[in-house]
Amino acid sequence: MKPSIISKLDSLNERYEELEALLGDASVISDQDKFRAYSKEYSQLEEVVKTFSRWKQLNSNIEEAELLLDDPEMKEMAQMEIEESKNELEEVEQHLQILLLPRDPNDEYNAYLEIRAGTGGDEAGIFAGDLFRMYSRYAEMKRWRVEVLSENESEQGGYKEIIALVSGDNVYGQLKFESGGHRVQRVPKTESQGRIHTSACTVAVMPELPESEMPEINPADLRIDTYRASGAGGQHINKTDSAVRITHIPTGMVVECQDERSQHKNKAKALAVLASRLVQAEQDKLAAEQATTRRNLLGSGDRSDKIRTYNYPQGRVTDHRINLTVYRLDEVMNGKIDELIQPIITEYQADQLAALSDQP
């Protein structure tokens, strides 16, 4: 392992011991904000420190075993100890480097999930509904909560657009690679000739930012319209103008929310979505600039980037970013998408490790 990495690990170890002492200090215990912040930092460092401790122990084991190689009676046992320790050391070093990768501070946040029907007419709307059901079932398996903020239903079923807030542990970290174009190839129910059609939807995943991190939005840049919330088929579901549509004039972004019966609550939710969209747009712009110099699995910021194809006749799903194909389409559409999500996260970490190893 590089001396620079060992030096960084030593510093983290010192900080861990410092935090341990601080958490036992009466003045910190009486200050809930400080205690909470230190506890969080302490728990984040715990795995790194314990893994580093194991790394040091394995190196010590190897050094001690090497001293026994000249002893004929102990040589065989020493060689076994060295081999076993070196094998484990390799795994521990790899794990340590992953733990040292820069953390995306947004990973632990809840996420807004937006699904929009694209090309393909009614079939695209039906597929948007299928995707929302897939993510909802995945959320259920993860014990996350899904709250629909806005929905525009398609005439043949599914959605022209749906926006939901997904709440739980590490939601954004798990779902952020889902942003992009999702394409479906199948025979629509309305197709009498049995021809395969291709339709598409775009998915956008954005972190729900805490108020302290939300950008300031100039009220003069907003146009706010109110209207009556509609249910399926267009019927009005209440008699007051509680639904809210906010247009951000400089960017043309439009956010609607009709989830609550209170206009005030709908406005607050719509503003929160708008704030996240504005931050995401800025991050996408940076991602597009980075994508010109290196591969970026988070995409170039273009929501039409085709990331995945769902082929029903062949029962397969292909992720085009890492050339991964699985032949368990039914399971995937029922929410079992970890086998698509985890390889992308692993590949992203490998890219980060490669960038880290290029540093002096």
Curated annotation (Swiss-Prot):
Methylated by PrmC. Methylation increases the termination efficiency of RF1. This is Peptide chain release factor 1. The lineage of its organism: Bacteria, Pseudomonadati, Pseudomonadota, Gammaproteobacteria, Pasteurellales. Peptide chain release factor 1 directs the termination of translation in response to the peptide chain termination codons UAG and UAA. Pfam families: PCRF (PF03462), RF-1 (PF00472). SMART domains: PCRF (SM00937). It comes from Mannheimia succiniciproducens (strain KCTC 0769BP / MBEL55E). Keywords: Cytoplasm, Methylation, Protein biosynthesis. InterPro entries: PCRF, Pep_chain_release_fac_I, Pep_chain_release_fac_I_sf, Prokaryotic/Mito_RF, RF-1. Belongs to the prokaryotic/mitochondrial release factor family. It is found in: Cytoplasm.
